[in-house]
């Protein structure tokens, strides 16, 4: 009986994957990296849509989202149907948190990006309406200095015009960084992002 249930569960899982339904799951929240497997890291300022992007990739709501910045304050780990790990890092630059909390978040981020971490690639997410900020430039310099592969994801392009998007792409070109314009909300260009995650 148990074998039959397992068989039907495996068939159901296979059909979900075959039909394009993402089989993602939340693993755990940690103040430091609690896994040694290769992983993709998502980082950005508070409220740029990191958690919304995780949900869009998973095709279901597995990450908690909020209109209030600073919701994510730990490392949140997820795994997809291919057993790949994804990490949603705390957002930086939110002024309305206490200095103690800000220092804690800074320590978590700095601790995660140590040179010996098993990070396959880092995706720094921007709010396309705002563009690059000084804090983004500092974070970009730090990640590159640590030797990690970096991609820029300009999110919320559904709320921008062609001129703003052209400026963003030109800024990325000057920085010599790969930049992808996306909308986690409308799922624009998520298929191109999926290719980078292969």
Swiss-Prot record:
Q: Which cofactor does it need?
A: Mg(2+)
Example GO molecular function: metal ion binding
What keywords tag this UniProt record? Cell cycle, Cell division, GTP-binding, Magnesium, Metal-binding, Nucleotide-binding, Septation
Q: Where's the EngB-type G domain?
A: 36-198
Q: Where does this protein hold Mg(2+)?
A: 51, 72
Name the positions where GTP binds. 44-51, 70-74, 88-91, 155-158, 182-184
- Signal peptide positions on this chain: none
Q: Which CDD domains match?
A: YihA_EngB
* PROSITE patterns cross-referenced by the UniProt entry: G_ENGB
What family does this belong to?
A: Belongs to the TRAFAC class TrmE-Era-EngA-EngB-Septin-like GTPase superfamily. EngB GTPase family.
**Name under which the protein is recorded:** Probable GTP-binding protein EngB
Which organism was this protein described from? Mesomycoplasma hyopneumoniae (strain J / ATCC 25934 / NCTC 10110)
Q: Which gene encodes it?
A: engB
């Amino acid at each position: 009986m148990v074998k039959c249930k397992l068989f039907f569960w495996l068939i159901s899982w296979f059909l979900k994957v075959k039909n394009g339904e993402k089989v993602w799951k939340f693993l755990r929240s940690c103040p430091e990296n609690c896994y040694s497997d290769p992983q993709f890291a998502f980082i950005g300022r508070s409220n740029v849509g990191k958690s919304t992007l995780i949900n869009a990739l998973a095709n279901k709501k597995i990450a908690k989202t909020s209109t209030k910045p600073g919701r994510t304050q730990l490392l949140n780990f997820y795994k997809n149907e291919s057993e790949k790990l994804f990490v949603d890092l705390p957002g930086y630059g939110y002024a309305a948190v206490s200095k103690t909390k800000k220092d804690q978040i800074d320590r978590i981020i700095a601790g995660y990006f140590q040179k010996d971490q098993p990070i396959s690639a880092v995706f720094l997410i921007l709010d396309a309406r705002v563009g690059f900020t000084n804090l983004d430039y500092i974070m970009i310099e730090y990640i590159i200095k640590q030797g990690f592969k970096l991609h820029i994801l300009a999110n919320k392009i559904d709320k921008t015009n062609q001129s703003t998007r052209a400026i963003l792409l030109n800024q990325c070109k000057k920085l010599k960084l790969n930049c992808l314009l996306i909308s986690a909300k409308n799922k624009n260009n998520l298929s191109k992002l999926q290719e980078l995650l292969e």
